[in-house]
Regions:
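Glycine-rich and polybasic anion-binding loops at the starts of cofactor/ligand-binding domains
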Residues: 1-181
């Protein structure tokens, strides 16, 4: 990120927490998945988990959303051991993510387990009336002798599409600040 010009984005009024879920039709979402490959999917639209397009599991490994794990005492030891342990506390974007993260992916593969399917983490920005600042965080834990293929991707349906309002015109440019531990 340090070579990315962000001043223009930071001068915009950004929406941090989208209040309304944006539903997308299958035709708009299907092209973002690996073609012809069966996979686990964790899909986020505008930073919100979308169970309609996701396929998660707790059989043999945990592939689910981070918020459900953070709220479940069963995962207390794993969370205290790994969550928020690898970020650089002097790095401003890591701190920004820690302050505003609402959701993300959680992948835990126990020792000696190999996932037979890849895991797709798909982030889609649907665009809309204001620019979004998304702060997804993923926690990935692969224990000894475990294997997993993880593909994380980010898409925007209308980057730079001009939005008009009565007061002014602005560009919809999402700012996505992802942290994966």
């Amino acid at each position: 990120w340090k070579y990315t010009p962000i001043r223009k984005v930071l001068n915009e009024e950004l929406t941090i927490f989208k209040k309304k879920r944006h539903l997308l039709e299958f035709d708009k979402v299907k092209d973002f998945f690996l073609g012809g490959i069966e996979s686990y999917k964790i899909v986020f639209i505008d930073g919100m988990y979308d169970p309609l397009w996701s396929s998660t599991t707790h059989e043999g490994a945990d592939i689910c959303i981070l918020s459900s794990v953070l709220e479940n005492k069963k995962y207390g030891n794993v969370i205290s051991k790994y969550y928020n342990k690898l970020i650089n506390e002097k790095e401003s974007f890591s701190l920004l993510n820690s302050s505003f993260t609402k959701e993300g992916a959680f992948i835990h593969v126990p020792k000696n387990v190999e996932l037979e399917k890849p895991v797709e983490i798909v982030h889609i920005n649907s665009g809309g009336e204001s620019s979004l600042m998304l702060q997804p965080r993923s926690l990935v834990i692969l224990e000894k002798n475990s294997k997993a293929q993880i593909i994380e991707s980010h898409y925007s349906l209308n980057v730079n599409e001009k939005i008009h309002s009565d007061k002014h015109s602005t560009y919809v440019d999402p700012l996505t600040n992802t942290v994966t531990e």
